[in-house]
Structure formats: structure tokens, C-alpha cells
Amino acid sequence: MNAKIKAKTRSQMIDELSKMLNIEKKQTKAFMDTYEAFLILELSRAKEVRLGNIGKFKVSVRAERKGINPKTGETVIIPEKTIPKFTFTKGIKEIINAGISIDNERVSIDDNDFDDDDEFVEEYIVSENN
């Protein structure tokens, strides 16, 4: 059984991206800051931002609804609320559910878990193995 892998912090991602791109951390951090600000700006303007083959952010309105105050048991009205949502593409969902295992920082994919119609997953595997 694999040990639980912790999510990377923002600074760890900046460090790794800097190494992968062979650029200074300052440049990578500046790019990430700008990119995040751009995504927020576009989401506030267009109400939807697509991230290539990863997924999309979307602004949704959660309708007014009834709820129960857990302390008093009293029924309360929860007001309408605007919230951001993120939805992954079908391809990413397939990859996540495709029998991927991680051992000592290496990723292996069980090819037997794919259906014939898993185009995106097949493309991903081919490009990763080359």
C-alpha cells in the first residue's frame, strides 16, 4: 500500500516548475501570480474560464433554500449565493480513475483499465511513454 502523498504547496510547485522550465523562481512566481490574477479577472468577467484539457471554472448561483440550524433545530432560509465551481474534463476523470499508481515518484498506468473509447487517455499514455 502506498504511503499517503501530501498535496504540494504553492511554493513547492513554483520550485518544481522553475526546475522543469529551467528558469528562476522569481520568474515562475511572477508568472503564477499573473496567471492567477488573470483567471480571477476572466472568471469575474466571462463567468467561465476553460483550462485546456484539464477542465473549466464556472460561476454558479446556488438558489435560496431551507436549512436547519444545528444548535436550535429551527428551520432557516439560506439566501441565494454566487459560488465558483470547477469541473474536470472527461479525459482527466478517466486518467484519475484508470488505475494509476505512484511508487517512489514514478507513475505507472494499468493499460487493462481502459476502454476502446478512451481516446484522450490513450493519447496521454502514448505521449507519456515516448
From Swiss-Prot:
Alphabetic keyword roster: DNA condensation, DNA-binding
Keyword Nucleus: no
Superkingdom in the source lineage: Bacteria
GO biological process: chromosome condensation
Keyword Nucleotidyltransferase (UniProt): no
CDD domains: HU_IHF (cd00591)
Cysteine pairs bridged by disulfides in the record: none
One term of GO molecular function: DNA binding
Role: Histone-like DNA-binding protein which is capable of wrapping DNA to stabilize it, and thus to prevent its denaturation under extreme environmental conditions.
Entry similarity comment: Belongs to the bacterial histone-like protein family.
Protein name as catalogued: DNA-binding protein HU
Native source organism of the sequence: Ureaplasma parvum serovar 3 (strain ATCC 700970)
